[in-house]
């Protein structure tokens, strides 16, 4: 009973000395705002098709049928200029030429731009595309939003899956595509990209650390007018430009 009576007095004394009760410090959000409210975009499996156009200046890598007479191809100029591979939205013409509708930002020295597609099932929402970049290993994924005959770049998923492979008598680290482990949510131009599995490799945590291994559930990217990296439930601010 004495302890129960003394405790309120002690609290009152602390309040009196401090000039009033202290305001509680708001906790950092554990997830980006309204993360759970964003609808899920489902993976859309599109087979790679044979080339259906002839183009004098483009070397076609892969072709996909998006429906309604529109196709997407990953292609590069056959003079191998520095901009490298891109995604092209087009309609095939009767003479086998391509009527180009839109194109993505270039992949520069990447030798691959293998796309993975996500959809809400409503064509009006467009498609979210993540395109794997790399040469022999994955460098990460460029995220695009294909909507209204345009291909908008959202940002870069700077992550890959790390695997260990034994060749002859030596074991090597390989970085492979994160696409099979990527989940997409989005609505009205806001998108979130999260990852499944045990762990992933983050190439740059924007805090001075490179090639960091992290639990996959702790890494998230968000697009809401700007591209954001969230780690362990907190927004990471990139260092100021020097």
Task: Set out the residue ranges of the language-model regions.
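C-terminal motif of bacterial Sec signal peptides marking the signal peptidase cleavage site
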Residues: 14-16
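Extracellular-facing segments of soluble proteins and assemblies that are Gly/Ser/Thr-biased and enriched
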Residues: 111-146
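Structural signature of eukaryotic scaffold interfaces centered on beta-propeller domains
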Residues: 53-68, 114-124, 175-187
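Acidic, small-residue rich beta-repeat scaffolds with periodic aromatic anchors
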Residues: 18-56, 143-159, 164-242
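Short beta-strand elements that form the blades of beta-propeller/WD-repeat-like
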Residues: 69-78, 123-135, 186-196
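Short, solvent-exposed loop/turn segments at conserved positions within beta-propeller repeat blades
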Residues: 78-85, 135-139, 211-215
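Terminal domain-start segments
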Residues: 20-113
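Sec-dependent signal peptide recognition
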Residues: 2-9
